[in-house]
A protein has these predicted regions:
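Disulfide-stabilized extracellular recognition modules
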Residues: 1-3, 7, 14, 88-160
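Short, surface-exposed glycine/acidic/tryptophan-bearing loops
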Residues: 43-93, 111
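Short glycine-/small-residue-rich flexible loop motifs, especially phosphate/cofactor-binding loops
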Residues: 25, 70, 108
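Mature, folded catalytic cores of secreted/periplasmic enzymes
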Residues: 28, 36, 74-76, 121, ...
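A short alpha-helix/helix-coil micro-patch that ends at or immediately precedes a cysteine
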Residues: 1-56
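Loop/turn elements at helix/coil->beta-strand transitions in domains of secreted/extracellular proteins
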Residues: 29-34, 78, 82-83, 116-119, ...
């Protein structure tokens, strides 16, 4: 039987982003770590990288301009610490992609990182149906919380 191509329709962004947030939070709760909240600036960083990976036609963590995940998060205006980034080039749905990430120890560690508090998730879909997914996790600036110290931005964990 012919498989149906997964197409993301216009106006689906919020539904997809919150479906992923709910799924990630269920996985995090099951692992005994705190839940995340959606962050618009991390969403913007993820969207920028998804489009850029499509232009480069390769799934990797560096932008065509040499930018790192940390650079993109800072450019998007996120003032916290970047915890990690997961990426994928696939024809699979967001939940199939999340499941695949959870099967890999390096990406699972990013998704379940206990220091993360914020989530950004976005994608770029090509006309042939290929989807470039990017998830970015961050932690707010802990220096603003009494009794907490901020971790340096360069301590990010990047996983593929």
């Amino acid at each position: 039987p012919k498989t149906k191509l997964y197409r993301i329709g216009p106006g689906s962004a919020n539904r997809i982003q919150f479906r992923v947030l709910d799924s990630v939070n269920a996985l995090r709760q099951a692992a005994g770590v705190s839940t995340l909240q959606m962050d618009a600036k991390l969403n913007a960083a993820a969207a920028t990288h998804s489009r850029d990976m499509a232009v480069q036609n390769r799934p990797w963590h560096f932008g065509s301009d040499g930018s790192s995940p940390i650079d993109r998060v800072q450019r998007a205006g996120y003032s916290g610490r970047m915890v990690g980034e997961t990426i994928s080039e696939t024809y699979e749905t967001e939940l199939q992609t999340l499941s695949a990430w959870m099967e890999e120890p390096s990406t699972r560690a990013v998704i379940l990182d206990p220091t993360a508090r914020d989530l950004g998730f976005s994608w770029h879909q090509e006309s042939n149906g290929k989807i470039w997914w990017t998830m970015v996790l961050g932690s707010p600036d802990l220096a603003a919380i009494p009794g907490m110290a901020a971790a340096p931005l360069d301590s990010a964990v990047n996983a593929g």
